[in-house]
From Swiss-Prot:
One of its GO terms (molecular function) is proton-transporting ATPase activity, rotational mechanism. This is V-type proton ATPase subunit E. Subunit of the peripheral V1 complex of vacuolar ATPase essential for assembly or catalytic function. V-ATPase is responsible for acidifying a variety of intracellular compartments in eukaryotic cells. The lineage of its organism: Eukaryota, Viridiplantae, Streptophyta, Embryophyta, Tracheophyta. Keywords: Hydrogen ion transport, Ion transport, Transport. V-ATPase is a heteromultimeric enzyme composed of a peripheral catalytic V1 complex (components A to H) attached to an integral membrane V0 proton pore complex (components: a, c, c', c'' and d). Pfam families: vATP-synt_E (PF01991). The keyword Transport applies.
Length: 229
């Protein structure tokens, strides 16, 4: 083997070693990259696991806060609706109260009504002697019907005619524009036993209050049933 052949053989060996080294280096590089990617993925997953509970906790806090805010807004809306309903009902009651003044303004019909109220009050009290209180403007009307009211009561209750004393202290006058929300009486009577232990308020205002309270569920149903549906 001459020098040329030896030189060729050495070059072939060098190429082989270099190729093998490059392949080995490439394998190492690929393996290192795969290992790096695996470690990177593991680190990412580990961080996700750390972050997830905190994220879930904050997400729950946000959901709870949203529910609370929604509930508060819903309650506020309901309160506004109820307030509007109450305002409407109260305005109807105020209009009805204004109508009472027309009742007492018609003396012909009001006089008959006063008699009925006195008889009804006597039947409730069933006392031999009572004290009657009315508005100052109604005294003459009450005195005009008093005897017939006593006789009607005595006939219905099958008792002697009672003694009725018209009190010198009067019920408040009817409401005016200046004292619309002050103490007032739209008409009617208040009867009490002599000792004052039994009192029956049979004023127009008291009867309106009782009737309105009794009919309130029906009024609300008729006014707001469609809105509720």
């Amino acid at each position: 083997m001459n020098d040329t052949d030896v030189q060729k053989q050495i070059q072939q060996m060098v190429r082989f070693i270099r190729q093998e080294a490059e392949e080995k280096a490439n394998e190492i590089s690929v393996a290192a990259e795969e290992e790096f990617n695996i470690e990177k993925l593991q680190l990412v997953e580990a961080e996700k696991k750390k972050i997830r509970p905190e994220y879930e906790r904050k997400e729950k806090q946000v959901q709870v806060r949203r529910k609370i805010e929604y509930s508060m807004q819903l309650n506020a809306s309901r309160i506004k609706v109820l307030q509007a309903q109450d305002d409407l009902v109260n305005s109807m009651k105020e209009e009805a109260a204004k109508e009472l003044l027309r009742v007492s303004g018609d003396h012909h019909h009001y006089k008959r009504l006063l008699k009925e109220l006195v008889v009804q009050s006597l039947l409730r009290l069933r006392e031999p002697g009572v004290l009657l209180r009315c508005r100052e403007d109604d005294v003459h009307l009450v005195e005009h019907v008093l005897n017939s009211a006593k006789e009607e009561y005595a006939e219905k209750a099958e008792v002697h005619t009672p003694e009725i004393i018209v009190d010198s202290i009067h019920l408040p006058a009817g409401p005016s524009h200046h004292k619309e929300h002050g103490l007032h009486c739209s008409g009617g009577v208040v009867l009490a036993s002599r000792d004052g232990k039994i009192v029956f308020e049979n004023t127009l205002d008291a009867r309106l209050e009782v009737a309105f309270r009794k009919k309130l569920p029906q009024i609300r149903k008729q006014l707001f049933a469609v809105a509720a549906a």
